[in-house]
């Protein structure tokens, strides 16, 4: 836990104050069919009102996962704060087989002790399935809640939780000297801060695998350039500024390489930079356009978009050589693929019959499932645990962020009120 807080602390260097309207998750589909669970409001052990409603944050996290449906506090048969106070039969009567209880205790030094217990109400009724406590300052209370959520989620699903992750995205605001901003927020839209402001467009943010840096495209010099920015101190390193287009950066999972697309020789082609030496190697060539690289987990293969067959489709190529292999066959065109962290599937933008939606393709069976029904969907990015996808879509006259589970059942949006939001990128585990 202390290590996790140290990693996250690097982000605080860039925090001054939240100067912009934040995005917030609004669930649109899928909660009613999810597993019911009880998340009791955490008992506040101090005077006045608690600085954060920890139980509400944990409940929202579990609801946002699409796998749980926390019942309303008004429907709870009791509101215990410890496992010993839980009456299992009262909960199982409502079809609930697990309950989260907890407390928040203020300390004399100004910090807070957050504790929780996950209680089984059915199998081994009354037994504690998971428990923990964290001592944090006020500004880390939400992070402590997300940590509890991660532990509860993993215990109940066997899948690592991703509630302590963040998302990067580009916002185009209405007017001002610097209308283009690269921002980062918690996965749920809270704690938003600006990484970089620019008078010219910003595009395609991509996280380093340790979460300490973001690569992106900037047009501040009058032409496109690829840069890597360190979040802890704001330092910017330019990595590519060749003639014509420089775009679509993607860090390799092992953190040693950066893939991107350049059109310095005419057509767009894929290149890979060794981040240690700065050496650049060309991966694809020819007259077709090859772009939008996404790494497979082995850090040796790329999925990418190519129009070599006429319309854009997704291909796979080894960065050390060999013929590319076409991956996508369904739909009139497919592009903007993101490979899942385990390499078993990819999500992509699939166009067919005039519609443009996010689809999932199983890389073993080839089966394709359309996940979304929103309008002009773009730039999907998969959560590090592989359960959710964030993407951009058109709503009205603007662009907003949307969420969909990788099984297609849960859907939500993250509306913003101060501009168009595009190019979302989900962070690794932090």
UniProtKB/Swiss-Prot annotation:
Domain of life according to the entry? Bacteria
Fetch the Gene3D superfamilies from UniProt.
TolB, C-terminal domain (2.120.10.30), TolB, N-terminal domain (3.40.50.10070)
Q: What's in the GO CC field?
A: periplasmic space
- State if Cell cycle is listed as a keyword: yes
- Which BP terms in the Gene Ontology apply to this protein? cell division; protein import
According to its UniProt record, where is this protein located? Periplasm
Q: Which UniProt keywords apply?
A: Cell cycle, Cell division, Periplasm, Signal
Q: Per its UniProt record, what Pfam families does this chain match? A: PD40 (PF07676), TolB_N (PF04052)
List all membrane-crossing ranges: none
The record ties this protein, via SUPFAM superfamilies, to: TolB, N-terminal domain, Tricorn protease N-terminal domain
InterPro entries recorded: 6-blade_b-propeller_TolB-like (IPR011042), PD40 (IPR011659), Tol-Pal_TolB (IPR014167), TolB_N (IPR007195)
This protein's record includes keyword Signal: yes
Family according to the record: Belongs to the TolB family.
Q: What does this protein do?
A: Part of the Tol-Pal system, which plays a role in outer membrane invagination during cell division and is important for maintaining outer membrane integrity. TolB occupies a key intermediary position in the Tol-Pal system because it communicates directly with both membrane-embedded components, Pal in the outer membrane and TolA in the inner membrane.
Q: How does it assemble?
A: The Tol-Pal system is composed of five core proteins: the inner membrane proteins TolA, TolQ and TolR, the periplasmic protein TolB and the outer membrane protein Pal. They form a network linking the inner and outer membranes and the peptidoglycan layer.
Q: What is this protein called?
A: Tol-Pal system protein TolB
């Amino acid at each position: 836990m202390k290590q996790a807080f140290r990693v996250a602390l690097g982000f605080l260097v860039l925090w001054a104050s939240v100067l912009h309207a934040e995005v917030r998750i609004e669930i649109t589909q899928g909660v009613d069919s999810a597993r019911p669970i009880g998340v009791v409001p955490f008992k506040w052990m101090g005077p006045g009102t608690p600085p954060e409603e920890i139980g509400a944050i944990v409940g929202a996290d579990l609801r946002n996962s699409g796998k749980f449906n926390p019942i309303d506090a008004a429907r709870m048969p009791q509101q215990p704060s410890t496992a010993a106070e839980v009456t299992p039969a009262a909960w199982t009567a409502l079809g609930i087989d697990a309950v989260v209880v907890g407390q928040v205790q203020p300390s004399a030094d100004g910090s807070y002790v957050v504790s929780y217990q996950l209680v089984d109400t059915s199998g081994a009724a009354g037994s504690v399935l998971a428990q923990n406590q964290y001592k944090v300052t006020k500004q880390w209370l939400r992070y402590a809640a997300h940590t509890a959520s991660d532990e509860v989620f993993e215990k109940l699903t066997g899948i690592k939780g991703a509630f302590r992750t963040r998302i990067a995205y580009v916002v185009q605001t209405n007017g001002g000297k610097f209308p283009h901003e690269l921002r980062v927020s918690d996965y749920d839209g809270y704690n938003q801060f600006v990484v970089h402001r620019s008078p010219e467009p910003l595009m395609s943010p991509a996280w380093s695998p340790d979460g300490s840096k973001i690569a992106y495209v900037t047009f501040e010099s009058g032409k496109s350039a690829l840069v890597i920015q360190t979040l802890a101190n704001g330092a910017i390193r330019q990595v590519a500024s060749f003639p014509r287009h420089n775009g679509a950066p993607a860090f390799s999972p092992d953190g040693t390489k950066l893939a991107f697309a350049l059109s310095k020789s005419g057509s767009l082609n894929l290149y890979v930079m060794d981040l240690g030496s700065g050496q650049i190697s060309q991966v694809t060539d020819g007259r077709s356009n090859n772009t939008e690289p996404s790494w497979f987990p082995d850090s040796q293969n790329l999925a990418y978009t190519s129009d070599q067959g006429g319309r854009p489709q997704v291909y796979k190529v080894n960065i050390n050589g060999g013929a590319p292999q076409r991956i996508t066959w369904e739909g009139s065109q497919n592009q903007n693929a993101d490979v899942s962290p385990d390499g078993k599937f990819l999500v992509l933008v699939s166009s067919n019959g005039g519609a443009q939606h996010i689809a999932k393709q199983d890389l073993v069976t080839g089966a394709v499932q359309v996940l979304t029904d929103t309008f002009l969907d773009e730039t999907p990015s998969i959560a590090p645990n592989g359960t959710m996808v964030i993407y951009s879509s058109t709503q009205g006259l603007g662009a907003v962020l949307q969420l969909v589970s990788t099984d297609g059942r849960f859907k939500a949006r993250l509306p913003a009120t101060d501009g168009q939001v595009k190019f979302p990128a989900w962070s690794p585990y932090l």
